[in-house]
């Protein structure tokens, strides 16, 4: 039980994060692991969506040329990140449907009036093989990181039982992904195929 008015939340507020050299040296996992997944092929002047199928839905990439957005609610807190097709913008949607990356039954809708701000997350770095972006200095990067952290809901930041911060797909992005999966499996969208995808 709690003694002297201490409980789990009280204690965790006093914990320090990242003590010792094991954090600094990335002990146990010194290499940055990553996987390259092709999501589009260049055909003449346009990008054609592509993907590799997997038996595990979480390993199937989101196809095509995409845009990433952060949605802030009326409290000025980040409520979700959203992946859209290249030609979509949440600012043009009266209702924003947030689809789960893999689960068809999981989705939620946000009215545009409930969104205070839509922030584009991508920046153009290279254009026609040339650098077109001026990289910020370390202090500017730190300031942006701090501002982003401040705009997270406290429930996402807490150490015990944190809320999950969602990254979702627009309805159009979800439909594109499902259509491509179905065509690669030789099935009709929305129906199960007896053919198993290659991993």
Regions found by a protein language model. Name each.
Residues 2-199:
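Gly/Ser/Thr/Ala-enriched C-terminal appendages of enzymes
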């Amino acid at each position: 039980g709690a003694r002297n008015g201490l409980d789990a939340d009280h204690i965790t507020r006093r914990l320090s994060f990242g003590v010792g050299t094991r954090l600094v040296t990335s002990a146990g996992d010194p290499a940055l692991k990553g996987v390259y997944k092709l999501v589009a092929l260049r055909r003449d002047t346009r990008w054609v969506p592509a993907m590799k199928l997997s038996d595990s839905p979480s390993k199937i990439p989101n196809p095509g040329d995409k845009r990433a957005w952060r949605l802030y609610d009326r409290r000025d807190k980040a409520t979700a990140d959203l992946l859209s097709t290249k030609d979509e913008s949440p600012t043009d949607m009266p209702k924003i449907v947030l689809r789960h990356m893999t689960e068809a039954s999981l989705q939620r809708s946000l009215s545009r009036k409930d969104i205070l701000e839509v922030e584009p997350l991508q920046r153009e770095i290279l254009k026609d093989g040339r650098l077109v972006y001026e990289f910020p200095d370390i202090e500017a990067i730190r300031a942006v990181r701090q501002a982003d952290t401040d705009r997270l809901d406290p429930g996402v930041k807490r150490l015990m039982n944190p809320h999950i911060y969602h990254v979702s797909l627009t309805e159009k992005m979800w439909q594109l992904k499902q259509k491509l999966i179905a065509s690669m499996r030789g099935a009709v969208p929305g129906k199960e195929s007896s053919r198993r995808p290659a991993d």
